[in-house]
Curated annotation (Swiss-Prot):
Keyword line: ATP-binding, Magnesium, Manganese, Metal-binding, Nucleotide-binding, Nucleotidyltransferase, Transferase
The encoding gene: ydiU
Enzyme class at the top of the EC tree: transferase
Species this protein is from: Salmonella arizonae (strain ATCC BAA-731 / CDC346-86 / RSK2980)
UniProt KW Manganese keyword: yes
Reactions this protein catalyses: L-seryl-[protein] + ATP = 3-O-(5'-adenylyl)-L-seryl-[protein] + diphosphate; L-threonyl-[protein] + ATP = 3-O-(5'-adenylyl)-L-threonyl-[protein] + diphosphate; L-tyrosyl-[protein] + ATP = O-(5'-adenylyl)-L-tyrosyl-[protein] + diphosphate; L-histidyl-[protein] + UTP = N(tele)-(5'-uridylyl)-L-histidyl-[protein] + diphosphate
Spans traversing the lipid bilayer: none
InterPro entries listed in its UniProt record: adnlytase_SelO, SelO
Family recorded in the similarity comment: Belongs to the SELO family.
Chain sites annotated for binding Mg(2+): 249, 258
Necessary cofactors: Mg(2+); Mn(2+)
Lineage: Bacteria, Pseudomonadati, Pseudomonadota, Gammaproteobacteria, Enterobacterales
Protein name, entry field: Protein nucleotidyltransferase YdiU
Pfam families (alphabetical): SelO
Enzyme Commission number(s) of this protein: 2.7.7.-, 2.7.7.108
């Protein structure tokens, strides 16, 4: 089957990009590709059989129909207007046309200098591309909306970060790379007609059912807000901290995008800060819902030329509703509740208080809880708490709540084990794969990718364990 590419963005939004070609790396070579995703997208295996160079995966060649562009956008970074930003090291190669008529962006990250590189070098490093590939695939298999990773290329091109590292490229796929920052760019340039063109493009390609509706813009922004709310609820329930929730890193489609200084919770710490550059803790774990709302408010401001204030406020309310509804549903599933009862939040918050006090592992606590037997007063989870009396009191109340459900242990455990993963991408697991890859050993990278495809299967090895001492509180930054 021949791959078919189109260029809707390039053809329909001429003010939003610069056309240019990728700049290949020195002695580039393909070290990993996503075989399952490639099969789903009918990408010929021969494209990955590159023995001389890195082909399209390293920006050395283009596939028929590709029309590369670097997109321009602006944004608020750490709550401050940063002005023009844009694709400083990434290039949208083209949009794959799928069988159902939809499209999929092929975005090459680390593709070289663009007009939007500012003071950067246009490059990505092996460390950051490995982290993003692992994180995006981990999130996908956890059921959380995300961009996807298709391939990684490394090279002999030296790139200076905190130390000198190997230049690399990541092929990232997404239904769209449209960001809140695209709208901000033209709003602050006082070009409202281009803001509206962006909204029209989004509706035409991603919500075509509303194209002819008189209230199409109201419906669209309300859905953007709702998707954002559901995404943040998913992050909070799985224990994911994005680390750099600038408006230019927010997806119009409600996807997790731009994996940098992210982190999955080890110990339960609601104030967890993944990004060591976030000195004020703006993007700490428990502040993510508030930041997402703030970002939506910035987006809403750009839409005031063609959406009434009342409609914008209704959409922002929809964010709160979607967030709380999804969060409640997810947490009840994690606790094994099939019905909603008024004291559920009390029980959940009591557990969180216990976990925070004891430094309990977030992922392992919920996974162990999912093996609870309703009639048994004992639990393997008990041994992980120092204050056994406090745990026993909570566990008695929890089992009493389970007895109000007309559901047997097997069905409840099955539900809980389908939403409480045994494995998440802890920073130390990613770092172990990175350390090996930087020495030329890609086995751990491939192994970890395979394991992350089955996060809900119990394991008795270190992929499901707490981090070793060296792996606790690893510092990551935007260069990660």
């Amino acid at each position: 089957m021949t791959l078919s590419f189109t260029a809707h963005w390039r053809d329909e939004l001429p003010a939003t990009y610069t056309a240019l070609l990728p700049t290949p790396l020195k002695n580039a070579r393909l070290i990993w590709y996503n075989d399952k995703l490639a099969q789903q997208l009918a990408i010929p295996a021969s494209l990955f059989d590159v023995t001389n160079g890195a082909g399209v995966w390293g920006g050395e060649t283009l596939l028929p129909g590709m029309s590369p562009v670097a997109q321009v956008y602006s944004g608020h970074q750490f709550g401050v207007w940063a002005g023009q930003l844009g694709d400083g090291r990434g290039i949208l190669l083209g949009e794959q046309l799928l069988a159902d008529g939809s499209t999929l962006d092929w975005h090459l990250k680390g593709a070289g200098l663009t007009p939007y590189s500012r003071m950067g070098d246009g490059r990505a490093v092996l460390r950051s591309t490995i982290r993003e590939s692992l994180a995006s695939e981990a999130m996908h298999y956890l059921g959380i909306p995300t961009t996807r990773a298709l391939s990684i290329v490394t090279s002999d091109t030296p790139v200076q970060r905190e130390t000198q590292e190997a230049g690399a490229m990541l092929m990232r796929l997404a239904q769209s790379h449209m960001r809140f920052g695209h709208f901000e760019h033209f709003y602050y340039r006082r070009e409202p007609e281009k803001v509206q063109q962006l909204a029209d493009f989004a509706i035409r390609h991603y919500w075509p059912q509303w194209q002819d509706a008189p209230e199409k813009y109201d419906l669209w922004f309300e859905e953007v807000a709702a998707r954002t709310g559901r995404l943040i609820a998913d992050w909070q329930t799985i224990g994911f901290a994005h680390g750099v929730m600038n408006t230019d890193n927010m997806s119009i489609l409600g996807l997790t995008i731009d994996y940098g200084p992210f982190g999955f919770l080890d110990d339960y710490d609601p104030g967890f800060i993944g990004n060591h550059s976030d000195h004020q803790g703006r993007y700490r774990f428990d502040n993510q819902p508030s930041v997402a709302l703030w970002n939506l408010q910035r987006l809403a401001q750009t839409l005031t030329p063609f959406i009434e204030i009342d409609a914008l406020n209704r959409a922002l309310d929809r964010y709160q509703d979607a967030l709380l509804t999804r969060y409640g549903q997810r947490m009840r599933q994690k606790l094994g509740f099939f019905t909603e009862q008024k004291d559920d939040n009390v029980l959940l918050n009591e557990l969180f208080s216990l976990m925070a006090r004891e430094g309990s592992d977030y992922t392992r606590t919920f996974r162990m809880l999912s093996h609870t037997e309703q009639q048994s007063a004992s639990s393997p989870l008990r041994d992980t708490f120092i204050d056994r009396a406090a745990f026993d009191g909570w566990f008695d109340r929890y089992r009493a709540r389970l007895r109000t459900e007309a559901v047997d242990d097997a069905l409840r455990q099955q539900q809980m084990q389908s939403v409480n993963p045994a494995v998440v991408l802890r920073n130390w697991l990613a770092q172990r794969a990175i350390d090996a890859a930087e020495q030329g050993d890609m086995a751990e990278l491939h192994r970890l990718h395979e394991i992350l495809r089955q996060p809900f299967i119990d394991r008795d090895d270190d992929y499901a364990s707490r981090p070793p001492e060296w792996g606790k509180r690893l510092e990551v930054s935007c260069s990660s």
